[in-house]
Amino acid sequence: MENLTLVSCSASSPKLLIGCNFTSSLKNPTGFSRRTPNIVLRCSKISASAQSQSPSSRPENTGEIVVVKQRSKAFASIFSSSRDQQTTSVASPSVPVPPPSSSTIGSPLFWIGVGVGLSALFSYVTSNLKKYAMQTAMKTMMNQMNTQNSQFNNSGFPSGSPFPFPFPPQTSPASSPFQSQSQSSGATVDVTATKVETPPSTKPKPTPAKDIEVDKPSVVLEASKEKKEEKNYAFEDISPEETTKESPFSNYAEVSETNSPKETRLFEDVLQNGAGPANGATASEVFQSLGGGKGGPGLSVEALEKMMEDPTVQKMVYPYLPEEMRNPETFKWMLKNPQYRQQLQDMLNNMSGSGEWDKRMTDTLKNFDLNSPEVKQQFNQIGLTPEEVISKIMENPDVAMAFQNPRVQAALMECSENPMNIMKYQNDKEVMDVFNKISQLFPGMTG
């Protein structure tokens, strides 16, 4: 701001005048020359004093007042002079500096952190949606298989039999055709073996014929009985203990359950017990790694549900979901499950912590509206859109993983307040690698 400058001089010292021309007398200053305006001092406050010369060399006239006015709207000062000393003072009205508006949340680095938080949240929701859909599909398929298997379970065959059809009804044992042939052949042998002779007496001798008739059929009957017993043994080798009452697809279910990692069984345990398992990754660890604690209430499920209804958020998240899940009704269907809703609420509660970073992040996410003018203004200042920030971070998970480092979080917090604080981390390789990665992802970001 251009201020007023007062320049004073006496009649005996005309060289002190700046920008003045004298014609006949030193007492009458003429108009100022505007050709050299840069000579005039532009200071807010100037105080100058000069020792008076000897009374003999000074005329008895009073000091003159010279006011140099430069294009300013408002201020003038009064100049007084005496024989002993001269004083010139210039003052300018103090202009109050407006405080920074509360809507200015932070620098672009802070919005990068907001993008990391949103991407971590959406990634967790996406992974759980996939697991939940897979578990639901498996349960539906197994229920259909059990229903189909129950249709074959009738009284015609035992429930544990691996054969889908009952055995044919067993008839009463009948004589073998070989046995009848042998019997008939035995009778023929008996007849032909004996010679009919004229008996010398009235009583014939039936003893040899009776022995042949009794002995030979008994041998044939025993051989056929052994063959029959051997055939029966062939069907009785399978013990009933080896057959189980499970369905034919039970082995497949056991193999799939054995080979599945812990992460795939995480959500099934949540559905059954209503809480995450003690071992393995839980929902809260995602945001605890970002520095979150259990300081207070964080983002609510209702706010998340409202955020997922935003078309802009859907545009950012849906490309990373399977094709069958790119539907807003899917999220509503998921959130109807009380166990899944409670798990999400526990995870969101852990987002609020004791650090300043966590408080700012939580407060920002609570009232985060991509369509609000303040958010648009912030992203316009850094030359990026919310879609670009979040999509680039979700495409590069290394950046989100790097934000789990507490030193990176502290550096991001300090540099968001004052960009010159980055000089403190010039020798920290981890922090500088993260900043270099951010500068590569967002080349238009400054500050």
Curated annotation (Swiss-Prot):
Residues 1-43, 44-76 form a transit peptide. The chain crosses the membrane at residues 105-125. Changing N418A: No effect on stimulation of HSP93 ATP hydrolysis. Residues 148-214, 231-261 are annotated as: Disordered. Residues 148-160, 172-186 have a biased composition (Low complexity). Expressed in seedlings, flowers, leaves, stems and roots. The keyword Chloroplast applies. Changing N405A: Loss of stimulation of HSP93 ATP hydrolysis. Residues 126-447 are stromal. Gene3D superfamilies: 1.10.260.100. Disruption phenotype: Small and chlorotic, but not seedling lethal. Defective in chloroplast protein import. Residues 310-344, 386-425 form the STI1 domain. GO terms for biological process: chloroplast organization; protein import into chloroplast stroma. Residues 161-171 have a biased composition (Pro residues). The C-terminal half (89-105) of the Ser/Pro-rich region and the transmembrane domain are necessary and sufficient for membrane integration. Involved in protein precursor import into chloroplasts. Part of the motor complex consisting of a co-chaperone (TIC40) and a chaperone (HSP93) associated with the import channel (TIC110). Causes the release of bound transit peptides from TIC110 and stimulates ATP hydrolysis by HSP93. Involved in reinsertion of proteins from the chloroplast stroma into the inner membrane. Inserts into the inner envelope membrane from the stroma after import from the cytoplasm. The transit peptide undergoes a two-step processing. The initial cleavage to generate the intermediate found in the stroma is mediated by the stromal processing peptidase (SPP) while the final processing step by a signal peptidase I-type (SPase I), possibly PLSP1, requires association with the inner membrane. Part of the Tic complex. Interacts with HSP93, TIC110 and LTD. This is Protein TIC 40, chloroplastic. It comes from Arabidopsis thaliana (Mouse-ear cress). The gene is TIC40.
